[in-house]
Amino acid sequence: LYLIVDNTFLSPYFQNPLKFGADIVIHSGTKFLGGHNDTLAGFIVTNNEEVQEKLRFIIKTTGAGLAPFDCWLILRGIKTLGIRMERSQENAIKIANWMKKQPVVKHVYYPGLQEHPGYEIMKKQARGFGAMLTFDVDTEAHALQILESVRMIKFAESLGGVETLI
């Protein structure tokens, strides 16, 4: 039985689960690592040689390795990963604190808020809180009003690029 951690939201910049006992860590290269919404990639990381050899065999025999251009796109994104993660986190903290003051917002879920139940754990095992937050509003009508009113925020199915998404 292996402990597998999806580290997509924090990236290796903010958290390294192998240091805390994870056997396998998964990163979506499509998200923060790539950072430009222009490639499709994923990574599996382990420090277990037996698992590594099994994964290497699967990758080689199924042709699941990345093309050179996709590798270049990910490497290009990693060059700016630090500044993008820091700025995204700064913005998330500001937005979370602003949302807490809005009368229609009933709850803000963001581990960077001191009242979040995972705040202390995050401080111990990560170097940051990331940029992902969510919130509840009081009525469906207010939720629809928010969705229809946003101008700078894009509707999208992916994350980690330069756009703010809802």
Predicted segments with their positions:
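Conserved C-terminal alpha-helix-loop-beta "cap" of PLP-dependent enzymes
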Residues: H107-I166
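Conserved PLP-enzyme active-site core in the AAT-like
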Residues: L1-V104, Y109
